[in-house]
Swiss-Prot record:
GO terms for cellular component: ribonucleoprotein complex; ribosome. Belongs to the universal ribosomal protein uL4 family. Part of the 50S ribosomal subunit. Pfam families: Ribosomal_L4. One of its GO terms (molecular function) is rRNA binding. This is Large ribosomal subunit protein uL4. The lineage of its organism: Bacteria, Pseudomonadati, Bacteroidota, Bacteroidia, Bacteroidales. Residues 45-78 are annotated as: Disordered. NCBIfam families: rplD_bact.
């Protein structure tokens, strides 16, 4: 399909760009999207949670009371799990939560969420731009010109390559994220409701 290209003033340039139907008009696969989001979040987990078990704790191993005759419950040493301050039974251990998906599945997940955003009218293609210096106001002006209400929308800007001035200009705005095509993932697309794609990024995205 063809879509209009806008400039940073929010005006149509009179030019159009083709967004491939194979990327922006596919039938969403909810289960694949779920798997890819789960993979992304699982891979971010540190997995360093650890609690000491009975054999790892210091302290006397002396039995606290005799086995029979006290009238109370049986107790072992001071590290017994049944006592306050004792060891934990089956506590967490360091582990790797990450898992992998096939490339085709990850591509399908990205296509699914891109198609959803396109169907909702949340995709805008803007001609390439940059800022001379990092200024939050310039980025807010850009959003205003594109009729994007930052207060009510979450925005993802997709760059062809890293641009520090654009990144720094948007960093102080809580509902705005900036990424590059090479780092684009399903979770980030799903987490926002508006996408601003720079013109030079379209070719790479069409190859998803």
């Amino acid at each position: 399909m063809e879509v209009n290209i806008f400039n940073i003033k929010g005006e149509e340039t009179g030019r159009k760009v083709i967004l491939e139907d194979s990327v922006f008009r596919v039938e969403p696969n909810d289960y694949i999207v779920y798997l890819d989001v789960r993979r992304y979040l699982a891979n971010k987990r540190q997995g360093t949670a650890k609690s000491k078990e009975r054999s790892e704790m210091s302290g006397s191993t002396r039995k606290l009371g005799r086995q029979k005759g006290s009238g109370g419950a049986r107790r072992g040493d001071i590290n017994s799990p049944v006592l306050v301050g004792g060891a934990r039974v089956f506590g967490p251990k360091p582990r790797d939560y990450s898992f992998k998906l096939n490339k085709k599945e990850k591509k399908m997940a990205r296509r699914s969420v891109l198609s959803c955003r396109m169907r909702e009218g949340g995709v805008i293609v803007v001609e390439d731009f940059s800022f001379e210096t990092p200024k939050t106001k310039e980025f807010l002006d850009l959003a205003k010109n594109l009729k994007i209400q930052i207060a009510n929308s979450k925005l993802l800007v997709i760059l062809p390559e890293k641009d520090d001035n654009i990144f720094l200009s948007a960093r102080n705005i809580s509902k705005v994220k900036v990424t590059t095509v090479s780092n684009l993932n399903t979770y980030e697309i799903l987490d926002v409701n508006r996408l601003v794609i720079l013109e030079s990024s379209v070719v790479a995205i069409n190859n998803f």
